Curated annotation (Swiss-Prot):
Primary localization class, coarse: cytoplasm
Signal peptide: none
Name this polypeptide is given: Myosin-4
Pfam families the UniProt entry points to: Myosin_head (PF00063), Myosin_N (PF02736), Myosin_tail_1 (PF01576)
GO BP terms in the entry: muscle contraction
Domain Myosin motor: 86-780
UniProt source species: Sus scrofa
Molecular-function annotations in GO: actin filament binding; ATP binding; calmodulin binding; double-stranded RNA binding; microfilament motor activity
Residue span of region Disordered: 1116-1164
Gene: MYH4
Phosphoserine PTM sites in chain numbering: 1090, 1094, 1160, 1235, 1241, 1259, 1276, 1286, 1290, 1301, 1304, 1472, 1493, 1512, 1540, 1552, 1572, 1598, 1601, 1712, 1724, 1737
SUPFAM superfamilies associated with the record: Myosin rod fragments, P-loop containing nucleoside triphosphate hydrolases, Tropomyosin
């Protein structure tokens, strides 16, 4: 758990991601009782927290936090997790895992706005319904490169893990973001894309030329900008989501080999086209329509000829028009900006807006029906003109094509007339097609823009698809969306539960298969299997006369009662009609099939499509360019069938879905589950039951369980050994081949981890959750230790090199000082002055010759430099040519790779085509069989129909006879149905009425009127029955003819299908042959791959052996270093003795110098013997020069050999330098003492004794030198042994290279080689530039030395020799560099030839490999990656061996040179000893002078010591200052180090005192001042030695003051740094205090917000309740008003009827005066009518009693209806019949009105026309009276039938009550048994967990014991080794002493 400081990198997002330290501490200290703290089931909240009060008899009494007391069963109580698990980030870590624990953890995190939570292997996110600051740039940076356990849960963490897995595992990844609609999938998708665009940013603009209208955005900008554009055209507001994606998309983000963005592409699925023309009330259309009308860009309003009011356009105003959470104006600007960034041209942009506006105008097109025709015609042309203008069409042509489309009939085209409804349907279809095609075209354009043509290796796919939807009205779009989610959930279940456990079984891991019950195959097969829903739908679309009803009937026949997931929906009042129900994983959905056939066929007006193809708007013409109209099809293809190109929407959808699932299966998936917290979109509120339902459906708990029980992490053995062997390399034995599995077992066994947390499979090692992260942390720590140790060794080596250089400079300074002192002593001698004058004259000729030679050399040097420049230019040109060749080869390799990829794609396409053809063949075969069966059935039916036709002709007369009987039965049935309908209407009205009395009166009145109306309607119904039956007979004859025609069509279709079948079979045979060839190739490739695998294993074994030998060599090197350390100690003693001797000799020399100037007699004697001394001095000087040259060579060789032999040779060189220095000092002292030999003979005797002692010491040194020689011989023997081993290694390496060369000729290996050669060329160029710089510096230095020589040739003869020496060294350097340059150019030429040969081989090999690897790309990539890793190891081992070989050769060369120089030095040392013995007699003479000058020597010695101490202190301080400045200037270190080394070499040649240039600039300036002071003192010939000393002291003091100032400034800087660090700490403390205060304030604010939220929730509940009451009251009032209005209408109609009756009676009375008979008949009719009214009133009373009884039995009837399926079916049928009768009733009412009208006319005619009309009316009245009597009889029969049904309902009710009681008893028994089973399971699981814990503890203790024993053994062995080494060291020390 991270601290608050570590969380500070997340900025303001930290509180929303992880609990603070204070909260964690409070949670840990919170009181908690694990036995009583529980969750308890509760009806309202599902689960609540509580405390156990008591447990008795399987019942638990719990007191909830709200204070309520509940008594529940044991299985309804769940233990609570300790407080430290509150708001836990990974729910798989919980102690108690159950539904309430998961629910409350999500709820508490959601309340704290921590919306992301891990759930085992996947992530759960809850929609916050508000903006949170958790997606800022600093959050993206904080999550980059973090492991999952290192950072809080977040979508960025999932994304980064996928990114890292892609890079390390070399496998494509996918992120599946799923959830219901409105759960937040789209937002998370955008965040994933934002993360990848940020971390894998390329930062490079597109390389194509900028074109007008294009913004040059980077690839990441374009990827991010694709979302706003797609959301504007593809997202809309739905009931559950304000920004719902109405299409699915799969975004693939491609990455290059380095992990940078390469390109991207988008695949879309099933845009919801119907939303363009239709929306529900609470929804709206796509955002782009409302963005355009937001008036943010007024120029769009003018261009599109629209207004800003959405209600002006029918297509977009059927639902809501505004969304509170969306600002359409801002979204329009974002959409417009995205169009520009994505590179759409200005014409394309304008056409997009124009087509969108045209769709809006389509909704306003009006059509009307022509008079006296069904033909439609335009109702105005203004809207059509606007739409046609925007689409680049002629409005007249458009209207003509809509109203009079051309249709192909046979081989001719005819003009077809359209009804108004057909025209509206065609307009809607065209609008949807234009919008859909435009959307798909935009996606294609986006993909073209995102395809950068850069090389890409892997991709990460992000899936965002419409969530699961359950609406009131669910159509074909909802079925497709829900089916997609069903498939994705099945993919998740299969991946998480099935594949996981199957892999355990396959790998041989002990595992008991767990069935989680999450298989969704039944529902998926129901939809997509043959004869499933989609199959039936597509089959129906093939038949021209299929309807929605026939489709529904087929669904019922195939699936109703046969599949548990297919059900018949139950009717619900207030909801849309549903035809079938499916049980999905997320719930039961009712589907309405209305219009599915048209949606699936997606028909278009071909005439209008032809106009589109000729449009002046290029985009519109392009959209429909590929669609051929019926006219073009007829002209181009003749009579060819169009079924071959016919593809339904469902088929296209299934094809895309199968592609998606194939893509997902080929990737490594990462799941993100989005959860809806509530249905009201309220931030912070969580509905328990809703969340639990989603958790159960998504398999969250099951995923956590399998994560805890299973082994989610697994690695191949070879990969594990390669990656983690660094944890304990000693566990894997070196030098012998060991299997990767055994190596992994040993490695894991040697690591301190819980061994129950992993299992070994056949090919992989499996880990429990979290263990792999622990191993990664251990590996990181180990690598950090190794790197730290390596850095320490490198720093130590560099500092030792620096120290050696400092010591060399110190010794050079001492030498120069000594020479200057000696020169200052002799320069005032007269003879010396004479010598100075004569010497140049003698050597002037030689000097001129030397100058001439130098000029010649200079000219040669210039020529050589010109030649080297020319060669350099040639090499640069060659390098350019090589680079060009390299680029050409890379292009060729890329082209070959593209060709390979194309071949693979073609192969994949062929395989897919084969699979599709096989499926089509199967479908065609099945369809042919079905057609044959149908044909046989039709043939039989034809025969039957022919027979039946003859029988029908005979039976027509019988039917006419039985017609009356049928009519009676029909009327009886209708009466029964009508009575049941009236009963249901009464029941419905009973629910709605306000008071019983008012409702009863209204029903009675209305029922009376309805009965009267119905009685009149039935009269007309009976008259039309006969005509209907006759029409049915005619229809049967017509259907017979149609069946004949259909049979003919089927026979033609059968012949065509047989032809297609033959073609398909032939293509199948070809495909089978191709398949066999591919199988043979595949077998060959597998054999080749097995051979390659064996070779790779051999290579691994050789690599292991080489690594073992390298380690042995390293151990031997360590032993040599230990011996060198011992030798170093002995050398320190010798050095101490040499320092003592040098000090004594210096004292002697100083005394002798003082004694030399004591007396004039001694000076005279010196003059006499000056000649002898000069000769001796020349000899000594020559010897000294030889020794100095030898010392310089030894120092150089010593510096070269230090890298291999370490401190041993360094000490030896230091001894040699001390001896040479002593020799030179002794010779100089002998020179000075020779002039005083006669006067100090006594002192010589004493000095002779001292020389004897020195000889003894030299003999000791000689013995030590012999020991060194012996050591060198041993090293030579060791070198020979190493040489033989190196030869063996080289032979093995040659064999290895021969084997590896076959594998290393791939594209990537050659690319690495070319880059290596390029780097070598750059290094050569740098070396040449350094050489040129060195030559130029040497020329400059030669000029300087020449000037010094001309100026001071009288006083500096010795410096002249030094200059000549420097020139010779420069020449050596030059010749060396020239030879090296020539050699390197030859090597470069050779390398170029090798490279050309290798490139040629590579081309051949690449061609061969490309030809071989078409179908094995994925396997090839994996093996190639493994080979690359092996190649890296081989190259490293080759490089190491080559370096060892090179070092060995250098070592041999150095040893030989060292041996030769040592022999020469030994000879010179012997000569010096002889010379020293010859001069020892003379040394006795100076003994007295030595004694006399002892006091002066002591004083000089003290001064010398002080000066030396000061110089050493200054040197150390300078070194410290150099280190400090070196640390400050790390960037310049390498360049200036090379420069300083060359400069130091040249400065040593010219005897300067400068330090390295560029390292210490300030100290270099001071040393230059010192040099100028020394030069000036040399030029001043008359200055005394004392003045020189004072000058030195002044220089030292100035250096000291400068150094003190430097130290003070450094101390000030350190003090300021400490002060700043203190201030920073104080600021951090203040910041922590401020953060704590802020967190407290935020917590108080959250508490206040929580209280406010609770208050707001209560207030919202109260307001909702009040609103519900108001709605109910308003509904009741509306119903009352409607009823009152109906009553008023009925009263008005009654009054009108009464008036008309009175008028008719008056007219009849008038007519009766003229015709008495008619009057009497009318009177009898009125009496009969009154009698009928009394009878009807009696019947009405009886009906009221029946209705009252039905009301009393209402509740029982409802239960009976729900429980009895057959009764429900009866009621459904009766309801359908009732609806049909209701329509008939309305028709009859219209008929009654017509009859009434006719009656009035008849009466008028009767008044006018005479007796015939009256007689007809009298006959009609008699018929009516007969019909009324018949109707009365039917009513009586209906009453009897109703009573029978009531008895049946009562019986069913009693039976249902008994069944319900039995079910309850059985349910109680089942619950008890289940509770017992759960208790037993829980006890077993607890016991198992306890045993596992004990077993793990035992294994851990056993492992620790074994490790302790191993450590004890190792420590004991180390102690023994140390003892042996200490004894050896002790014996060596004793022997040396």
């Amino acid at each position: 758990m991270s601290s608050d400081q570590e969380m500070a990198i997340f900025g303001e997002a930290a509180p929303y991601l992880r609990k603070s330290e204070k909260e964690r501490i409070e949670a840990q200290n919170k009181p908690f009782d694990a036995k009583t703290s529980v969750f308890v089931a509760e009806p309202k909240e599902s689960f609540v927290k509580g405390t156990v009060q008591s447990r008795e008899g399987g019942k638990v009494t719990v007191k909830t936090e709200a204070g309520a007391t509940l008594t529940v069963k044991e299985d309804q109580v769940f233990p609570m997790n300790p407080p430290k698990f509150d708001k836990i980030e990974d729910m798989a870590m919980m102690t108690h895992l159950h539904e309430p624990a998961v629910l409350y953890n999500l709820k508490e995190r959601y309340a704290a706005w921590m919306i992301y939570t891990y759930s085992g292997l996947f992530c759960v996110t809850v929609n916050p319904y508000k903006w949170l600051p958790v997606y800022n740039a600093e959050v993206v940076t904080a999550y980059r490169g973090k492991k999952r356990q290192e950072a809080p849960p977040h979508i960025f963490s999932i994304s980064d893990n996928a990114y890292q897995f892609m890079l390390t595992d070399r496998e494509n990844q996918s992120i599946l973001i799923t959830g219901e609609s409105g759960a937040g999938k789209t937002v998370n998708t955008k965040r994933v894309i934002q993360y990848f665009a940020t971390i894998a940013v390329t930062g490079e603009k597109k390389k194509e030329e900028p074109t007008p209208g294009k913004m040059q955005g980077t690839l990441e900008d374009q990827i991010i900008s694709a979302n706003p554009l797609l959301e504007a055209f593809g997202n809309a507001k739905t009931v559950r989501n304000d920004n719902s994606s109405r299409f699915g998309k799969f975004i693939r983000i491609h990455f290059g080999t380095t992990g940078k963005l390469a390109s991207a592409d988008i695949e879309t699925y099933l845009l919801e086209k119907s939303r363009v023309t239709f929306q529900l009330k609470a929804e709206r259309s796509y955002h782009i329509f409302y963005q355009i009308m937001s008036n943010k860009k007024p120029e769009l309003i003018e261009m599109l000829l629209i207004t800003t009011n959405p209600y002006d356009y029918a297509f977009v105003s059927q639902g809501e028009i505004t969304v509170p959470s969306i600002d359409d104006q801002e979204e329009l600007m974002a959409t417009d900006s995205a169009i520009e960034i994505l590179g759409f041209t200005s014409d394309e942009r304008v056409s997009i807006y124009k087509l969108t506006g045209a769709v809006m105008h389509y909704g306003n097109l009006k059509f009307k029906q022509k008079q006296r025709e069904e033909q439609a015609e335009p109702d105005g042309t203004e809207v059509a003109d606007k739409a046609a203008y925007l689409q680049g069409l002629n409005s007249a042509d458009l209207l003509k094509a809509l109203c009079y489309p051309r249709v192909k009939v046979g081989n001719e085209f005819v003009t077809k007339g359209q009804t108004v409804q057909q025209v509206y349907n065609a307009v809607g279809a065209l609008a949807k097609a234009v919008y859909d095609k435009m959307f798909l075209w935009m996606v294609t354009r986006i993909n073209q823009q995102l395809d950068t043509k850069q090389p890409r290796q892997y991709f990460i796919g992000v899936l965002d698809i419409a969530g699961f939807e359950i609406f009131d009205f669910n159509s074909l779009e909802q079925l497709c969306i829900n089916f997609t989610n069903e498939k994705l959930q099945q993919f998740f279940n299969h991946h998480m539960f099935v594949l996981e456990q199957e892999e355990y079984k396959k790998e041989g891991i002990e595992w008991e298969f767990i069935d989680f019950g999450m298989d969704l195959a039944a529902c998926i097969e129901l939809i997509e299997k043959p004869m499933g829903i989609f199959s039936i739908l597509e089959e129906e679309c093939m038949f021209p006369k299929a309807t929605d009803t026939s489709f529904k009937n087929k669904l019922y026949e195939q699936h109703l009662g046969k599949s548990n997931n297919f059900q018949k929906p139950k009717p619900a009042k207030g909801k849309a009609e549903a035809h079938f129900s499916l049980i999905h994983y997320a719930g039961t959905v009712d589907y309405n099939i209305t219009g599915w056939l048209d949606k699936n066929k997606d028909p278009l007006n071909e005439t209008v499509v032809g106009l589109y193809q000729k449009s002046s708007v290029k985009t519109l013409a392009f959209l429909f360019a590929e669609r051929q109209s019926s006219e073009e099809g007829g002209t181009k293809k003749g009579g060819k069938k169009k079924g071959s190109s016919f593809q339904t929407v469902s088929a296209l959808f299934r094809e895309n879905l199968n592609k998606l699932m194939t893509n997902l299966r080929s990737t490594h998936p990462h799941f993100v589950r989005c959860i809806i917290p509530n249905e009201t979109k309220t931030p912070g509120a969580m509905e328990h039951e809703l969340v639990l339902h989603q958790l159960r459906c998504n398999g969250v708990l099951e995923g956590i369980r399998i994560c805890r029980k299973g082994f989610p992490s697994r690695i191949l053995y070879a990969d594990f050994k390669q990656r983690y062997k660094v944890l304990n390399a000693s566990a894997i034995p070196e030098g012998q081949f060991i299997d990767s599995k055994k190596a992994s077992e040993k490695l894991l066994g040697s690591i301190d981890i819980d061994h129950t947390q992993y299992k070994f499979g056949h090919t992989k090692v499996f880990f429990k959750a979290g263990l792999l992260g622990t191993l990664e942390e251990m590996r990181d720590e180990k690598l950090a230790q190794l790197i730290t140790r390596t850095q320490a060794m490198c720093r130590g080596f560099l500092m030792r090199v620096e120290f050696r250089k400092m010591m060399e400079r110190r010794e050079s300074i001492f030498c120069i000082q000594y020479n200057i002192r000696a020169f200052m002593n002799v320069k005032h001698w007269p003879w010396m002055k004479l010598y100075f004058k004569i010497k140049p004259l003698l050597k002037s000729a030689e000097t001129e010759k030397e100058m001439a030679n130098m000029k010649e050399e200079f000219e040669k040097t210039k020529e050589d430099l010109a030649k080297s420049e020319a060669k350099r230019k040639e090499l640069e040109e060659k390098m350019v040519a090589l680079m060009q060749e390299k680029n050409d080869l890379q292009l060729q390799v890329q082209a070959e790779a593209d060709g390979l990829a194309d071949a693979e794609e073609r192969c994949d396409q062929l395989i897919k085509t084969k699979i599709q053809l096989e499926a089509k063949i199967k479908e065609v075969t099945e369809r042919a069989e079905d057609e044959e069966e149908i044909n046989a059935e039709l043939t039989a039916k034809k025969r039957k129909l022919e027979d039946e036709c003859s029988e029908l002709k005979k039976d027509i007369d019988d039917l006419e006879l039985t017609l009356a009987k049928v009519e009676k039965e029909k009327h009886a049935t209708e009466n029964k149905v009508k009575n049941l309908t009236e009963e249901m209407a009464g029941l419905d009205e009973n629910i709605a009425k306000l008071t019983k009395e008012k409702k009863a009166l209204q029903e009675a009145h209305q029922q009376t009127l309805d009965d009267l109306q119905a009685e009149e309607d039935k009269v007309n119904t009976l008259t039309k029955a006969k005509t209907k039956l006759e029409q049915q007979v005619d229809d049967l004859e017509g259907s017979l003819e149609q069946e004949k025609k259909l049979r003919m069509d089927l026979e033609r279709a059968k012949r065509k299908l047989e032809g297609d079948l033959k073609l398909a079979q032939e293509s199948t045979m070809d495909i089978e042959n191709d398949k066999q060839q591919l199988d043979e190739k595949l077998k060959k490739k597998e054999f080749e791959m097995s051979n390659l695998q064996s070779k790779i294993e051999d290579e691994q074994a050789l690599a292991m052996q080489l690594q073992k030998k390298i380690k042995e060599l390293q151990a031997r090197t360590e032993e040599l270093e230990e011996e060198i350390e011992a030798e170093r100690a002995s050398r320190a003693k010798a050095e101490k003795q040499r320092s003592d001797l040098s000090r004594e000799l210096e004292e002697i020399s100083e005394r002798l110098e003082e004694a030399g100037g004591a007396t004039s007699a001694q000076i005279e004697m010196n003059k006499k013997r000056e000649a002898e001394f000069q000769k001796m001095r020349r000899d000594l000087e020559e010897a000294t020069l030889q020794h100095e040259a030898t010392a310089a060579a030894l120092r150089k060789k010593h510096a070269d050999s230090v890298a291999e032999l370490g401190e041993q040779i360094d000490n030896l060189q230091r001894v040699k330098q001390k001896l040479e220095k002593e020799k030179s000092e002794l010779k100089m002292e002998i020179d000075d003492l020779a002039s005083n030999m006669e006067t100090v003979s006594k002192a010589k005797g004493n000095l002779e004794k001292m020389c004897r002692t020195l000889e003894d010491q030299l003999s000791e040194v000689k013995t030590k030198e012999e020991e060194h020689q012996r050591l060198i011989n041993e090293l030579s023997a060791q070198k020979a042994r190493l040489q033989t081993e190196s030869g063996e290694f080289s032979r093995q390496l040659d064999e290895k290279e021969a084997l590896v060369s076959q594998l290393s000729r791939g594209k990537q290996a050659f690319t690495q080689q070319i880059e290596e050669l390029k780097r070598q060329l750059e290094e050569e160029t740098k070396a040449k530039s350094a050489l040129a710089h060195a030559v130029q510096s040497s020329r400059h230095d030669c000029d300087l030395l020449r000037e010094q020589y001309e100026e001071e040739q009288e006083a500096k003869a010795e410096l002249q020799r030094a200059m000549s020496k420097a020139n010779s060294e420069v020449a050596q350097w030059r010749t060396k560099y020239e030879t090296d340059a020539i050699q390197r150019t030859e090597e470069l030429e050779e390398a170029k030839k090798k490279l050309a040969q290798r490139l040629q081989d590579a081309e051949e090999h690449v061609e061969a490999v490309n030809a071989k690897c078409a179908s094995l790309e994925k396997t090839k990539q994996r093996l190639q990656n493994e080979v690359e890793d092996l190649m890296l190891d081989v190259e490293r081992s080759n490089a190491a061996c080559a370096a060892l070989d090179k070092k060995q050769r250098n070592f041999d060369k150095i040893l030989a040179e060292w041996k030769h120089k040592y022999e020469e030095t030994q000879a010179e040392l012997e000569a010096s000893q002889k010379e020293s013995r010859s001069l020892s007699t003379e040394l006795f003479k100076v003994k007295n002078a030595y004694e006399e000058s002892l006091d002066q020597l002591e004083t000089l010695k003290r001064e010398n010591k002080n000066l030396q101490q000061e110089i050493s202190d200054l040197t150390e301080q300078i070194a410290e200052g150099g280190k400090h400045i070196h640390e400050l200037e790390k960037v310049k270190k390498q360049i200036e180090q090379e420069k300083s080394e060359l400069q130091a070499a040249l400065e040593e040649a010219e005897a300067s005192l400068e330090h390295e240039e560029g390292k210490i600039l300030r100290i270099q300036l001071e040393l230059n001042q010192v040099k100028s002071e020394i030069d000036r003192k040399i030029a001043e010939k008359d200055e005394e030695i004392d003045q020189m000393k004072r000058n030195h002291i002044r220089v030292v003091e100035s250096m000291q003051s400068t150094l003190d100032a430097e130290i003070r400034s450094r101390n000030d800087a350190l003090r300021i740094k400490k002060k700043m660090e203190g201030d920073l700490n104080e600021m951090e403390i203040q910041l922590n205090h401020a953060n704590r205060q802020a967190t407290e304030a935020i917590r108080n604010l959250r508490n206040t917000q929580g209280v406010l939220k609770d208050t707001q929730l209560h207030l919202d509940d109260a307001i909702r309740g009040q609103d519900d009451l108001k709605e109910q009251l308003a509904m009741v009032e509306r119903r009352a008003n409607l009823m009152q209005a109906e009553i008023e209408e009925l009263r008005a109609s009654l009054e009108q009827t009464e008036r008309s009756r009175r008028v008719a009676e008056q007219e009849l009375l008038d007519a009766s005066e003229r015709v008495q008979l008619l009057h009497t008949q009318n009177t009898s009719l009125i009496n009969t009518k009154k009698k009928l009214e009394t009878d009807i009133s009696q019947i009405q009373g009886e009906m009221e009693d029946i209705v009252q009884e039905a009301r009393n039995a209402e509740e029982k009837a409802k239960k009976a209806i729900t429980d009895a399926a057959m009764m429900a079916e009866e009621l459904k049928k009766e309801q359908d019949t009732s609806a049909h009768l209701e329509r008939m009733k309305k028709n009859m009412e219209q008929t009654v009105k017509d009859l009434q009208h006719r009656l009035d006319e008849a009466e008028q005619l009767a008044l006018k026309g005479g007796k015939k009309q009256i007689q007809k009316l009298e006959a009609r009245v008699r018929e009516l009276e007969n019909e009324v009597e018949n109707e009365q009889k039917r009513n009586v029969e209906a009453v009897k039938g109703l009573r029978k049904h009531e008895r049946r309902v009562k019986e069913l009710t009693y039976q249902t009550e008994e069944d319900r009681k039995n079910v309850l008893r059985l349910q109680d028994l089942v619950d008890k048994l289940q509770s017992k089973v759960k208790a037993y399971k829980r006890q077993a699981e607890e016991a198992e967990e306890q045993s596992n814990v004990n077993l793990s503890k035992f294994r851990k203790l056993q492992h620790e014991l074994e490790e302790a024993e191993e450590r004890a053994d190792i420590a004991e062995s180390q102690v023994n080794k140390l003892r042996v080494k200490s004894r050896e060291v002790h014996t060596k020390v004793i022997s040396e002493e």
